[in-house]
């Protein structure tokens, strides 16, 4: 499958399909072992699986460093939450579930292995739920949370009552998972640790392919091979042909395109993007299906919706049912989620943490025809290092860029500040860049930049969103103290290459 050319891995053609899971993967849940303990239960993927098991009647407990909204939702179901990684949760010899975020030295995981307990990787547990029923798996570097949520919402509207395991929070089902009585399971499929290759969907979806996890993949070729295997294991593969890596390297059964790709069975034409909605004609194999209107903005969300259309039609749904459901879809938490408005400034939380995602989000924001203030927290030092130049050039659609220190996600920080170096590099392409050297200072500093009418977009997959409420309060207090006016004077303390390193007490121009 892998050819070596000039000392580098080259991507071979996609192999033939093998859509049935091998016997060694046939390990469904054992009702005679009814207890499960999740190490790191607060994570979005782990909490979704814990929710499904708890709703099925299994006895579930879990541990994590700190409680959050997901653990509190589980506690309301009767799940026992243990703060900290003690051995308390191993009493009674439960089956133990862990994710790739849990290191082998974790005391709970190490003790479970020493005791000979049944231990599941999160992906294997998902596979046990997923591979033995009609399933739809949504994979891709970007857009998989929104696309899987759209498909789930569509099937709910059609009365199919699906089970859903999603990587984001949806108000429609109050969380990141729901247990339905219908036969279909819709799951978001994670490629970050390569575990997508453990799943064998009836319908596999691939939204796009890029390098996003250099902590796991050495290069793009390795990423492509993982997606090739996932596509090979899908009975029917639905994929976006606008992505060159998809169109070139995958054997796609059902393609979709916004750009008129000639091999795409599903196409969006006569596309109109406005500040309120996105609309397009949807064509199926050369015939007009009808008009699609979305509340969620931007070309990336239209592409996500077109994937949902293709899946719905493959399942036999009428286009009118699909279009009605997608017209009602209001998005996923942390995906261009409006957190509130203060003094004419709209505060938005968005999970974008890859250059392509940032570009797509900021393009959608520009449709509002308002000044865009982008606040970005890099996520993982390895990602920032690998994609540094792409990050430096991805903020063109923001009028002001504010960068804060990198969220390491457990990675060791490099010497010096990689986020400050990013700010310096962004300033080579952008006239208005600010750097805040300490995240807790952000609510004290950002209000001095904001103006009535702004869109303040907080971008990142780390803990930046935890500063939004405090920033809104600080901006409200600032408005109460004095009218907000443009500051036209000299900026104190100019730093290298036009970057302002902002202290908490400074009032700066926008």
Curated annotation (Swiss-Prot):
Q: Which UniProt keywords apply?
A: ATP-binding, Cell cycle, Cell division, Cell shape, Cell wall biogenesis/degradation, Cytoplasm, Ligase, Nucleotide-binding, Peptidoglycan synthesis
Q: Which residues form the signal peptide?
A: none
The EC code for this enzyme is 6.3.2.8
Compartments where located: Cytoplasm
* GO molecular function annotation: ATP binding; UDP-N-acetylmuramate-L-alanine ligase activity
Under the heading InterPro entries, the entry gives: Mur-like_cat_sf, Mur_ligase_C, Mur_ligase_C_dom_sf, Mur_ligase_cen, Mur_ligase_N, MurCDEF_pg_biosynth, UDP-N-AcMur_Ala_ligase_MurC
| Gene Ontology BP terms | cell division; cell wall organization; peptidoglycan biosynthetic process; regulation of cell shape
Family named by the database record: Belongs to the MurCDEF family.
| Official protein name in the record | UDP-N-acetylmuramate--L-alanine ligase
